[in-house]
Curated annotation (Swiss-Prot):
<dbReference type="InterPro" id="IPR023400">
    <property type="entry name" value="RecA_C_sf"/>
</dbReference>
<keyword id="KW-0067">ATP-binding</keyword>
<dbReference type="GO" id="GO:0005524">
    <property type="term" value="F:ATP binding"/>
</dbReference>
<keyword id="KW-0742">SOS response</keyword>
<dbReference type="GO" id="GO:0003697">
    <property type="term" value="F:single-stranded DNA binding"/>
</dbReference>
<keyword id="KW-0233">DNA recombination</keyword>
<dbReference type="InterPro" id="IPR020588">
    <property type="entry name" value="RecA_ATP-bd"/>
</dbReference>
<dbReference type="GO" id="GO:0009432">
    <property type="term" value="P:SOS response"/>
</dbReference>
<dbReference type="Pfam" id="PF00154">
    <property type="entry name" value="RecA"/>
</dbReference>
<dbReference type="GO" id="GO:0006281">
    <property type="term" value="P:DNA repair"/>
</dbReference>
<dbReference type="GO" id="GO:0006310">
    <property type="term" value="P:DNA recombination"/>
</dbReference>
<dbReference type="InterPro" id="IPR049261">
    <property type="entry name" value="RecA-like_C"/>
</dbReference>
<dbReference type="InterPro" id="IPR020584">
    <property type="entry name" value="DNA_recomb/repair_RecA_CS"/>
</dbReference>
<dbReference type="GO" id="GO:0016887">
    <property type="term" value="F:ATP hydrolysis activity"/>
</dbReference>
<dbReference type="InterPro" id="IPR027417">
    <property type="entry name" value="P-loop_NTPase"/>
</dbReference>
<keyword id="KW-0963">Cytoplasm</keyword>
<keyword id="KW-0227">DNA damage</keyword>
Length: 342
Protein backbone atom coordinates (compact mmCIF):
# COMPACT_ATOMS: atom_id res chain seq x y z
CA UNK A 1 0.00 0.00 0.00
CA UNK A 2 1.10 3.57 -0.71
CA UNK A 3 2.85 5.14 2.35
CA UNK A 4 0.42 8.09 2.49
CA UNK A 5 -2.59 5.77 2.28
CA UNK A 6 -1.12 3.54 5.02
CA UNK A 7 -0.60 6.61 7.24
CA UNK A 8 -4.16 7.82 6.61
CA UNK A 9 -5.54 4.35 7.35
CA UNK A 10 -3.59 4.09 10.64
CA UNK A 11 -4.88 7.53 11.69
CA UNK A 12 -8.46 6.46 10.90
CA UNK A 13 -8.05 3.16 12.81
CA UNK A 14 -6.65 4.97 15.86
CA UNK A 15 -9.53 7.47 15.75
CA UNK A 16 -12.07 4.62 15.58
CA UNK A 17 -10.39 2.82 18.50
CA UNK A 18 -10.45 6.00 20.60
CA UNK A 19 -14.08 6.74 19.78
CA UNK A 20 -15.64 3.26 19.90
CA UNK A 21 -13.15 1.16 21.90
CA UNK A 22 -10.27 -1.17 21.06
CA UNK A 23 -11.10 -4.03 18.72
CA UNK A 24 -13.93 -2.22 16.88
CA UNK A 25 -12.02 -2.77 13.62
CA UNK A 26 -9.08 -5.08 13.02
CA UNK A 27 -7.13 -6.77 10.26
CA UNK A 28 -8.09 -10.42 9.81
CA UNK A 29 -4.40 -11.38 9.78
CA UNK A 30 -3.71 -9.77 13.18
CA UNK A 31 -5.74 -12.39 15.02
CA UNK A 32 -5.31 -16.12 14.68
CA UNK A 33 -8.44 -17.75 13.28
CA UNK A 34 -10.08 -19.87 15.97
CA UNK A 35 -12.39 -22.85 15.63
CA UNK A 36 -16.01 -21.93 16.34
CA UNK A 37 -17.03 -23.35 19.74
CA UNK A 38 -20.06 -25.64 19.52
CA UNK A 39 -22.66 -27.25 21.79
CA UNK A 40 -23.45 -30.89 21.00
CA UNK A 41 -27.00 -31.67 19.87
CA UNK A 42 -27.04 -35.04 21.64
CA UNK A 43 -27.03 -36.80 18.25
CA UNK A 44 -23.67 -37.97 16.88
CA UNK A 45 -24.97 -37.96 13.29
CA UNK A 46 -26.35 -34.41 13.57
CA UNK A 47 -23.12 -33.14 15.19
CA UNK A 48 -21.23 -34.53 12.19
CA UNK A 49 -23.76 -33.15 9.64
CA UNK A 50 -23.32 -29.68 11.19
CA UNK A 51 -19.59 -29.93 10.44
CA UNK A 52 -18.27 -28.43 13.70
CA UNK A 53 -19.47 -31.02 16.22
CA UNK A 54 -22.70 -29.27 17.22
CA UNK A 55 -24.57 -25.95 17.11
CA UNK A 56 -22.32 -22.84 17.00
CA UNK A 57 -22.05 -20.57 20.05
CA UNK A 58 -22.51 -16.83 19.52
CA UNK A 59 -24.98 -17.50 16.68
CA UNK A 60 -28.72 -17.76 16.05
CA UNK A 61 -30.17 -21.17 15.13
CA UNK A 62 -33.67 -21.89 13.81
CA UNK A 63 -35.23 -25.35 14.23
CA UNK A 64 -38.52 -25.86 12.40
CA UNK A 65 -40.80 -28.73 11.44
CA UNK A 66 -44.36 -30.09 11.65
CA UNK A 67 -46.10 -30.80 14.96
CA UNK A 68 -44.70 -33.69 17.05
CA UNK A 69 -41.54 -33.92 14.94
CA UNK A 70 -39.11 -33.59 17.87
CA UNK A 71 -38.28 -29.84 17.84
CA UNK A 72 -38.59 -29.27 21.59
CA UNK A 73 -36.99 -32.65 22.36
CA UNK A 74 -33.94 -31.72 20.28
CA UNK A 75 -33.56 -28.35 22.05
CA UNK A 76 -33.96 -29.96 25.49
CA UNK A 77 -31.24 -32.43 24.47
CA UNK A 78 -28.98 -29.47 23.56
CA UNK A 79 -29.71 -27.90 26.97
CA UNK A 80 -28.85 -31.21 28.72
CA UNK A 81 -25.52 -31.40 26.83
CA UNK A 82 -24.68 -27.76 27.68
CA UNK A 83 -25.52 -28.29 31.37
CA UNK A 84 -23.38 -31.44 31.42
CA UNK A 85 -20.43 -29.22 30.44
CA UNK A 86 -21.24 -26.70 33.20
CA UNK A 87 -23.25 -24.24 31.09
CA UNK A 88 -26.20 -22.10 32.21
CA UNK A 89 -29.35 -22.38 30.09
CA UNK A 90 -32.59 -20.42 29.76
CA UNK A 91 -35.91 -21.47 28.20
CA UNK A 92 -38.41 -18.80 27.10
CA UNK A 93 -41.63 -20.83 26.98
CA UNK A 94 -43.97 -18.68 24.89
CA UNK A 95 -46.18 -21.73 24.21
CA UNK A 96 -46.61 -22.36 27.97
CA UNK A 97 -46.15 -26.06 27.29
CA UNK A 98 -42.79 -27.03 28.85
CA UNK A 99 -43.05 -30.34 30.74
CA UNK A 100 -40.37 -30.36 33.48
CA UNK A 101 -40.83 -34.10 34.14
CA UNK A 102 -40.14 -34.94 30.47
CA UNK A 103 -37.20 -32.50 30.42
CA UNK A 104 -35.69 -34.23 33.48
CA UNK A 105 -36.01 -37.63 31.75
CA UNK A 106 -33.93 -36.27 28.84
CA UNK A 107 -31.13 -35.33 31.25
CA UNK A 108 -31.99 -31.65 31.83
CA UNK A 109 -31.20 -30.36 35.33
CA UNK A 110 -34.57 -28.62 35.77
CA UNK A 111 -33.54 -27.09 39.12
CA UNK A 112 -30.84 -25.03 37.37
CA UNK A 113 -32.86 -24.26 34.21
CA UNK A 114 -34.02 -20.63 33.98
CA UNK A 115 -37.61 -20.56 32.65
CA UNK A 116 -39.80 -17.64 31.57
CA UNK A 117 -43.46 -17.89 30.50
CA UNK A 118 -44.11 -14.40 29.10
CA UNK A 119 -47.51 -12.82 28.43
CA UNK A 120 -46.66 -11.13 25.12
CA UNK A 121 -44.19 -11.44 22.26
CA UNK A 122 -42.57 -8.12 23.20
CA UNK A 123 -42.06 -9.32 26.78
CA UNK A 124 -40.60 -12.65 25.59
CA UNK A 125 -38.02 -11.01 23.33
CA UNK A 126 -37.14 -8.33 25.92
CA UNK A 127 -36.57 -11.08 28.53
CA UNK A 128 -34.44 -13.00 26.00
CA UNK A 129 -32.36 -9.89 25.24
CA UNK A 130 -31.80 -9.08 28.93
CA UNK A 131 -30.71 -12.65 29.66
CA UNK A 132 -28.27 -12.59 26.72
CA UNK A 133 -26.86 -9.19 27.76
CA UNK A 134 -26.11 -10.55 31.24
CA UNK A 135 -23.31 -12.56 29.59
CA UNK A 136 -24.06 -15.50 31.90
CA UNK A 137 -26.25 -17.59 29.57
CA UNK A 138 -24.67 -20.27 27.37
CA UNK A 139 -27.84 -21.55 25.65
CA UNK A 140 -31.11 -19.64 25.18
CA UNK A 141 -34.18 -21.33 23.69
CA UNK A 142 -37.33 -19.51 22.50
CA UNK A 143 -40.27 -21.92 22.06
CA UNK A 144 -41.76 -20.91 19.71
CA UNK A 145 -41.74 -17.99 17.25
CA UNK A 146 -45.37 -18.73 16.29
CA UNK A 147 -46.44 -18.18 19.91
CA UNK A 148 -44.79 -14.72 20.15
CA UNK A 149 -48.07 -12.82 20.02
CA UNK A 150 -47.75 -9.01 19.74
CA UNK A 151 -49.34 -7.02 22.58
CA UNK A 152 -51.70 -5.21 20.17
CA UNK A 153 -53.12 -8.56 19.06
CA UNK A 154 -53.65 -9.81 22.62
CA UNK A 155 -55.40 -6.60 23.66
CA UNK A 156 -57.48 -6.36 20.45
CA UNK A 157 -60.70 -8.12 19.47
CA UNK A 158 -60.78 -11.67 18.12
CA UNK A 159 -61.54 -10.71 14.50
CA UNK A 160 -59.15 -7.75 14.23
CA UNK A 161 -56.58 -7.73 11.42
CA UNK A 162 -52.97 -7.15 12.46
CA UNK A 163 -51.09 -7.46 9.19
CA UNK A 164 -47.34 -8.06 9.53
CA UNK A 165 -47.21 -7.23 13.25
CA UNK A 166 -45.35 -10.38 14.26
CA UNK A 167 -42.91 -10.09 11.33
CA UNK A 168 -42.09 -6.49 12.31
CA UNK A 169 -41.65 -7.54 15.94
CA UNK A 170 -39.21 -10.32 14.98
CA UNK A 171 -37.29 -8.07 12.58
CA UNK A 172 -36.81 -5.35 15.19
CA UNK A 173 -35.89 -7.81 17.96
CA UNK A 174 -33.34 -9.69 15.85
CA UNK A 175 -31.64 -6.45 14.77
CA UNK A 176 -31.21 -5.65 18.45
CA UNK A 177 -30.32 -9.07 19.83
CA UNK A 178 -27.87 -10.42 17.20
CA UNK A 179 -24.87 -8.33 18.28
CA UNK A 180 -25.54 -9.11 21.95
CA UNK A 181 -25.61 -12.85 21.20
CA UNK A 182 -22.21 -12.60 19.50
CA UNK A 183 -20.67 -10.56 22.34
CA UNK A 184 -22.03 -12.93 25.00
CA UNK A 185 -20.97 -16.04 23.00
CA UNK A 186 -24.46 -17.42 23.62
CA UNK A 187 -26.21 -20.02 21.45
CA UNK A 188 -29.75 -18.75 20.73
CA UNK A 189 -32.21 -21.33 19.40
CA UNK A 190 -35.57 -20.26 17.98
CA UNK A 191 -38.11 -23.05 17.49
CA UNK A 192 -40.55 -22.36 14.65
CA UNK A 193 -43.68 -23.92 13.19
CA UNK A 194 -44.68 -24.57 9.59
CA UNK A 195 -47.56 -22.92 7.73
CA UNK A 196 -48.88 -23.49 4.19
CA UNK A 197 -48.80 -20.70 1.60
CA UNK A 198 -52.16 -20.44 -0.15
CA UNK A 199 -52.33 -20.71 -3.94
CA UNK A 200 -48.85 -22.15 -4.56
CA UNK A 201 -49.11 -24.35 -7.67
CA UNK A 202 -45.42 -25.22 -8.11
CA UNK A 203 -42.61 -25.58 -5.59
CA UNK A 204 -42.82 -26.04 -1.85
CA UNK A 205 -45.94 -24.44 -0.30
CA UNK A 206 -44.46 -24.64 3.21
CA UNK A 207 -43.18 -21.56 5.01
CA UNK A 208 -42.24 -20.64 8.58
CA UNK A 209 -43.98 -18.05 10.75
CA UNK A 210 -42.69 -14.63 11.80
CA UNK A 211 -41.58 -13.24 8.44
CA UNK A 212 -38.20 -13.56 6.73
CA UNK A 213 -35.93 -11.87 9.30
CA UNK A 214 -35.14 -15.07 11.22
CA UNK A 215 -34.13 -16.83 7.98
CA UNK A 216 -31.54 -14.12 7.31
CA UNK A 217 -30.18 -13.77 10.84
CA UNK A 218 -29.87 -17.54 11.48
CA UNK A 219 -26.41 -19.06 10.98
CA UNK A 220 -27.94 -22.55 11.02
CA UNK A 221 -31.45 -23.68 10.04
CA UNK A 222 -32.58 -27.25 10.75
CA UNK A 223 -35.63 -28.91 9.19
CA UNK A 224 -36.76 -31.78 11.44
CA UNK A 225 -39.31 -34.42 10.36
CA UNK A 226 -40.77 -37.62 11.78
CA UNK A 227 -40.39 -40.29 9.08
CA UNK A 228 -41.53 -43.44 10.88
CA UNK A 229 -42.03 -45.32 14.13
CA UNK A 230 -39.62 -47.33 16.28
CA UNK A 231 -41.33 -50.53 17.43
CA UNK A 232 -40.62 -53.17 20.04
CA UNK A 233 -42.88 -55.96 18.79
CA UNK A 234 -46.25 -54.26 18.27
CA UNK A 235 -45.58 -51.46 20.74
CA UNK A 236 -44.42 -48.07 19.39
CA UNK A 237 -41.50 -46.93 21.58
CA UNK A 238 -40.20 -43.96 19.58
CA UNK A 239 -39.90 -42.05 16.31
CA UNK A 240 -37.53 -42.31 13.37
CA UNK A 241 -36.44 -38.73 12.75
CA UNK A 242 -34.72 -37.04 9.81
CA UNK A 243 -32.96 -33.67 10.14
CA UNK A 244 -31.81 -31.62 7.14
CA UNK A 245 -29.29 -28.79 7.57
CA UNK A 246 -31.10 -26.31 5.29
CA UNK A 247 -28.70 -23.42 5.99
CA UNK A 248 -25.21 -23.45 7.49
CA UNK A 249 -22.86 -20.44 7.63
CA UNK A 250 -20.14 -22.26 9.61
CA UNK A 251 -19.69 -25.41 7.48
CA UNK A 252 -20.96 -26.87 4.17
CA UNK A 253 -24.80 -26.99 4.24
CA UNK A 254 -27.47 -29.36 2.85
CA UNK A 255 -26.35 -32.45 4.78
CA UNK A 256 -28.91 -34.65 6.45
CA UNK A 257 -28.99 -37.37 9.08
CA UNK A 258 -31.45 -39.81 10.61
CA UNK A 259 -31.72 -40.93 14.22
CA UNK A 260 -34.23 -42.37 16.67
CA UNK A 261 -36.02 -40.40 19.39
CA UNK A 262 -37.16 -42.88 22.05
CA UNK A 263 -40.14 -41.90 24.20
CA UNK A 264 -39.05 -40.99 27.72
CA UNK A 265 -35.29 -41.17 27.03
CA UNK A 266 -34.67 -38.87 24.04
CA UNK A 267 -32.19 -39.35 21.19
CA UNK A 268 -30.83 -42.89 20.91
CA UNK A 269 -27.17 -41.77 20.89
CA UNK A 270 -25.67 -45.20 21.71
CA UNK A 271 -27.61 -46.70 18.78
CA UNK A 272 -25.92 -44.12 16.52
CA UNK A 273 -22.50 -44.93 18.03
CA UNK A 274 -22.97 -48.61 17.14
CA UNK A 275 -24.26 -47.86 13.61
CA UNK A 276 -21.35 -45.49 12.85
CA UNK A 277 -18.90 -47.87 14.54
CA UNK A 278 -19.95 -50.70 12.21
CA UNK A 279 -19.90 -48.36 9.18
CA UNK A 280 -16.33 -47.20 9.92
CA UNK A 281 -15.05 -50.64 10.93
CA UNK A 282 -14.40 -49.81 14.60
CA UNK A 283 -17.04 -52.37 15.61
CA UNK A 284 -17.10 -55.82 14.00
CA UNK A 285 -20.47 -57.36 13.18
CA UNK A 286 -20.63 -61.09 12.51
CA UNK A 287 -24.19 -62.32 12.12
CA UNK A 288 -26.07 -60.91 15.11
CA UNK A 289 -22.92 -60.51 17.26
CA UNK A 290 -21.17 -57.17 17.77
CA UNK A 291 -17.48 -57.05 18.82
CA UNK A 292 -15.20 -54.18 19.85
CA UNK A 293 -11.40 -54.60 20.13
CA UNK A 294 -11.85 -58.36 19.80
CA UNK A 295 -14.32 -58.60 22.71
CA UNK A 296 -17.95 -59.53 22.08
CA UNK A 297 -20.21 -56.77 23.39
CA UNK A 298 -23.63 -58.25 22.62
CA UNK A 299 -25.86 -60.39 20.46
CA UNK A 300 -28.24 -58.06 18.67
CA UNK A 301 -28.14 -54.28 18.63
CA UNK A 302 -30.18 -53.83 21.83
CA UNK A 303 -27.75 -55.99 23.84
CA UNK A 304 -24.77 -54.10 22.38
CA UNK A 305 -26.43 -50.80 23.40
CA UNK A 306 -26.98 -52.20 26.91
CA UNK A 307 -23.27 -53.13 27.13
CA UNK A 308 -22.22 -49.58 26.18
CA UNK A 309 -24.72 -48.15 28.67
CA UNK A 310 -23.14 -50.24 31.46
CA UNK A 311 -19.55 -49.50 30.32
CA UNK A 312 -19.62 -45.73 29.84
CA UNK A 313 -15.81 -45.50 29.57
CA UNK A 314 -15.85 -47.83 26.53
CA UNK A 315 -18.76 -45.85 25.01
CA UNK A 316 -16.91 -42.53 25.53
CA UNK A 317 -13.65 -43.83 23.99
CA UNK A 318 -15.55 -45.25 21.01
CA UNK A 319 -17.47 -41.98 20.55
CA UNK A 320 -14.23 -39.93 20.69
CA UNK A 321 -12.67 -42.16 18.02
CA UNK A 322 -15.77 -41.84 15.82
CA UNK A 323 -15.80 -38.03 16.19
CA UNK A 324 -12.10 -37.94 15.31
CA UNK A 325 -12.71 -39.86 12.07
CA UNK A 326 -16.00 -38.22 11.11
CA UNK A 327 -14.99 -34.61 11.89
CA UNK A 328 -11.47 -34.99 10.48
CA UNK A 329 -9.50 -34.25 13.64
CA UNK A 330 -6.91 -36.45 15.35
CA UNK A 331 -8.01 -38.73 18.19
CA UNK A 332 -5.87 -36.72 20.66
CA UNK A 333 -7.53 -33.47 19.49
CA UNK A 334 -10.99 -35.01 19.96
CA UNK A 335 -10.14 -36.12 23.51
CA UNK A 336 -8.62 -32.67 24.29
CA UNK A 337 -11.73 -30.91 22.93
CA UNK A 338 -13.93 -33.15 25.11
CA UNK A 339 -11.75 -32.43 28.17
CA UNK A 340 -11.69 -28.65 27.52
CA UNK A 341 -15.47 -28.46 27.16
CA UNK A 342 -15.83 -30.17 30.53
Amino acid sequence: MDANKEKALQAALQQIDRQFGKGTVMRMGDKELEAIPAVSTGSLGLDVALGIGGLPKGRIVEIYGPESSGKTTLTLQVIAEAQRKGGTCAFVDAEHALDPIYAAKLGVNVDDLIVSQPDTGEQALEVADMLVRSGAIDVLVVDSVAALTPKAEIEGEMGDHHVGLQARLMSQALRKITGNIKNANCLAIFINQIRMKIGVMFGNPETTTGGNALKFYSSVRLDIRRIGSVKDGDEVIGSETRVKVVKNKVAPPFKQTEFQILYGTGINRLGEVIDYGVKLGLIDKAGAWYSYNGDKIGQGKNNAIQYLREHSDVAQTLEDRLKAELLGQSFDEAVEAEAESE
